[in-house]
A protein has these predicted regions:
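Conserved cytosolic headpiece of P-type ATPases
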Residues: 1-203
Length: 203
């Protein structure tokens, strides 16, 4: 799978492993995750993903999809997932609700971006949405929450903890509208003053 090992000690550790316990079929054999729950800001609890979501959940999936670099290709053998498993999980859920990544990219073009890195634990894009420059930030809730100025953070924190306790990988999604795109996009000028829109949980 062209995996890169960050710490050399991991090679020795993996070599001595005799039993691996995995959460579900596909995580190890296919490097694939599945989106199972979403929470929208203003709701009291998360909802399960069924493949036919309401307007609020679809908006969250659409927004999160725009801030993804992965893709889902349909082949005679089935879906071919390209990219990070957390991103393709979002894209597959969006596709089940009629939102194809390529069509989203065409309708809401990406104008700028800050790629994900392990220090920030965030990814940010600027897309043209409904005639506005929409900044979309996705990443770990504990990092993103400190950059949010609007939204029900108390409930979001509780939901994040509940999802995490059920072994879900949780990503938060937040946005803001800007008048002009900075000549040099940085974390300081894009990843602050955000409105929390929701959480996505996958396994």
């Amino acid at each position: 799978e062209n995996a890169i090992i960050r710490h050399l000690q991991a090679v020795e550790g993996l070599g001595s492993v005799s039993v691996i316990c995995s959460d579900k079929t596909g995580t190890l054999t296919q490097n694939r995750m599945t989106l199972t729950q979403v929470w929208m800001d203003g709701a009291s609890a998360p909802v399960d993903i069924t493949g036919r979501e309401d307007a609020a959940a679809c908006k969250l999936l659409r927004t999160a999809s725009l801030c993804c670099d992965g893709s889902v290709e349909v082949t005679p053998e089935g879906e071919k997932l390209l990219g990070d498993p957390t991103e393709t999980a979002i894209l597959v859920a969006a596709r089940k609700n009629g939102m194809e990544k390529k069509a989203l990219n065409d309708e809401f073009p990406r104008l700028a971006e800050l790629p994900f890195d392990s220090d920030r634990k965030l990814m940010t894009t600027v897309n043209r949405v409904d005639g506005q420059n929409l900044v979309i930030v996705k990443g770990a809730f504990d990092v993103l929450s400190s950059r949010v100025i609007a939204g029900d953070l108390e409930t979001a924190r509780r939901v994040n903890d509940e999802m995490s306790s059920r072994a879900l990988r949780v990503l938060a999604v937040a946005t803001k509208v800007i008048d002009e795109i900075p000549a040099e996009p940085t974390s300081e000028n894009l990843e602050s003053g955000l409105q929390l829109i929701g959480l996505v949980g996958m396994i």
